[in-house]
Curated annotation (Swiss-Prot):
Protein name: Small ribosomal subunit protein uS10
Gene: rpsJ
Disulfide bonds: none
UniProtKB keywords: Ribonucleoprotein, Ribosomal protein
Annotated InterPro entries: Ribosomal_uS10 (IPR001848), Ribosomal_uS10_CS (IPR018268), Ribosomal_uS10_dom (IPR027486), Ribosomal_uS10_dom_sf (IPR036838)
Pfam family, one: Ribosomal_S10
Gene3D superfamilies (UniProt xref): Ribosomal protein S10 domain
Length: 102
């Protein structure tokens, strides 16, 4: 019989709330008796934007902005129905994007 697995991928611009959310998910899953693999830090995605400082001239004067997207991966092996229920009821911060695959 094949074992079931839940893969949770977390994304956020702030690594602090991302690690806090990952810790909550791991604690909830361990409390309900599931096996955990992770959180695994995935590579940080860096997006760079370059804009002109002046609206009309001075092409040499530019400003750069960046957005860093931090990612974590958590695998829950052999989840129980109690694990799934407690993960659905879990309250996480609003700055974290959660992607769940069964």
């Amino acid at each position: 019989m094949a074992s079931q697995q839940i893969r949770i991928r977390l994304k956020s611009y702030e690594h602090g709330i991302l690690d806090e959310s990952a810790a909550k998910i791991v604690a909830t899953a361990e409390r309900t008796g599931a096996q955990i693999s992770g959180p695994v830090p995935l590579p940080t995605e860096r997006t760079l934007f370059t804009v002109l400082r002046s609206p009309h001239k001075n092409k040499d004067s530019r400003e750069q902005f960046e957005i860093r997207t931090h990612k974590r991966l958590i695998d829950i092996l052999n989840p129980t129905p109690k694990t799934v229920d407690s993960l659905m009821k879990l309250d996480l911060p609003s700055g974290v994007d959660i992607e769940i695959k069964l």
